[in-house]
């Protein structure tokens, strides 16, 4: 770096060369050089930090712990930063997730940028990163506060995606409510059901998943702000944190609260852990649904081919005309990633040694990743797979007629063992069930036709569609 391209600033360790036009200061520059690898700190975290710092500045002024002119200068600088688009905002926030596990460097990145910009906009006030922007706070309570805020924000985006998929499935459920097909257990033929009934199971699973998320989400409304370094609240002005919670609630539209045990808030992240457990459950259900759809669509000539899937793109670079269930594959890969993220979060949440957990940055990065990929793949699955999905009724009828497990309908009339022998005979001799049943002498043709009612076997009249 040539002389004209950098400036020298000092922190408590010593002088640091910093790019001349950078708004950040020495601690950010040290981190930039010390931790250059991995994904960048999510901008959701940065924006949450900015909202938190603004709320803190306003609150400190209101309780008399910050001069009004300094507080207003900090607020003004933050408003300028919040107005930037993501590309421009990123220029001043270059740090990575893999840094100190407390997120200290990212907290200081925000403090330094806000202070330097405030001094540019309001010369002469001498605003300092630690003494003014970080007043009454520490990385130990600000970073976990932003973690919960952005987690709630991410869930707010995921929930509509789940509802949208439910809506698309309900449309298909109603359309195919009385379309009878072969049921399958252990990947083997089983008794009939309707495709609508099968879809109702998917819908119910997603409704349960949505309710788990919604019921657990309020645990994330408990904010650690005010705990400062170890949970005692040292250096936080009385009344400041309650005001911060109120201001953040207005910004995000959720009832955040600070009346919680701060020692828990700094050393534990069980709220994020348990909520991510619900995301893992959603991912597991999505894997099952996507797997079912792609298997039922297998073929078209040498598979089940009960379902016709939309042709969204060419499926092969060598096999002409091939159509693949790509949206389902994206869902299953996303689910695999969520399972891995859950393991990361579970382990990282256990690392709250003494008064602070130092795996914070990787916990929230994994949580946000899960929310993002679930939101995207669920939306794509709804719009580009389920919406255009149709049933191959002719193929369903063919497989149903060839199934041996419809013999179950005869069991109440002729007994389990006699019915089993009919199925075994049909399979061994390659005949239809009806032929084997009549040959057994246990059933007349009239009885067979009466009892072998596929629709009646589904108990459709006792089933209720999911809405």
Task: List each language-model region with its residue ranges.
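Conserved, well-structured ligand/cofactor-binding cores
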Residues: 1-467
């Amino acid at each position: 770096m040539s002389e004209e391209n950098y400036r020298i600033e000092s922190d408590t360790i010593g002088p640091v060369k910093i790019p001349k036009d950078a708004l950040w200061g020495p601690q950010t520059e040290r981190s930039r050089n010390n931790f250059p690898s991995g994904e960048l700190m999510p901008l959701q975290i940065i924006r949450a930090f900015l909202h938190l710092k603004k709320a803190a500045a306003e609150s400190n002024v209101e309780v008399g712990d910050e001069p009004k002119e300094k507080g207003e200068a900090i607020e003004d600088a933050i408003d300028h930063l919040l107005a930037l688009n993501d590309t421009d905002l990123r220029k001043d926030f270059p740090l990575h997730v893999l840094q100190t596990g407390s997120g200290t460097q990212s907290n200081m990145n925000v403090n330094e940028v806000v202070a330097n910009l405030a001094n540019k906009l309001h010369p002469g006030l001498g605003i300092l990163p630690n003494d003014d922007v970080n007043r009454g706070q520490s990385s130990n309570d600000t970073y976990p506060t932003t973690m919960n805020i952005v987690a709630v924000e991410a869930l707010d985006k995921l929930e509509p995606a789940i509802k949208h998929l439910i809506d698309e499935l309900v449309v298909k459920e109603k359309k195919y409510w009385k379309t009878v097909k072969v049921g399958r257990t252990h990947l083997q033929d089983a008794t009939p059901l309707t495709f609508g009934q099968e879809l109702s199971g998917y819908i119910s699973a997603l409704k349960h998943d949505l309710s788990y998320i919604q019921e657990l989400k309020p645990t994330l409304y408990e904010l650690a702000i005010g705990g400062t370094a170890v949970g005692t609240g040292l250096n936080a002005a009385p009344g400041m944190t309650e005001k911060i919670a109120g201001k953040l609630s207005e910004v995000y539209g959720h009832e955040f609260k600070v009346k919680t045990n701060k020692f828990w808030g700094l050393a534990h992240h069980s709220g994020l852990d348990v909520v991510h457990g619900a995301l893992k459950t959603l991912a597991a259900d999505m894997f099952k649904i996507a797997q079912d759809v792609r298997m039922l669509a297998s073929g078209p000539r040498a598979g089940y081919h009960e379902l016709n899937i939309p042709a969204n793109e060419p499926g092969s670079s060598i096999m002409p005309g091939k159509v693949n269930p790509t949206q389902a594959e994206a869902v299953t890969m996303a689910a695999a990633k969520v399972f891995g993220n859950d393991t990361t979060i579970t382990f990282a949440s256990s690392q709250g040694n003494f008064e602070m957990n130092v795996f914070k940055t990787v916990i929230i990065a994994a949580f946000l990743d899960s929310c993002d990929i679930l939101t995207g793949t669920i939306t794509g699955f709804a719009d580009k797979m389920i919406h255009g999905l149709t049933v191959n009724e002719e193929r369903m009828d063919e497989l149903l007629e060839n199934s041996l497990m419809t013999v179950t309908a005869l069991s109440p009339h002729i007994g389990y063992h006699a019915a089993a022998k009919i199925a075994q005979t049909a399979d061994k001799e390659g005949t239809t069930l009806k032929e084997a049943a009549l040959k057994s002498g246990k059933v007349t043709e009239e009885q067979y036709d009466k009892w072998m009612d596929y629709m009646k076997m589904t108990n459709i009249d006792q089933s209720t569609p999911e809405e």
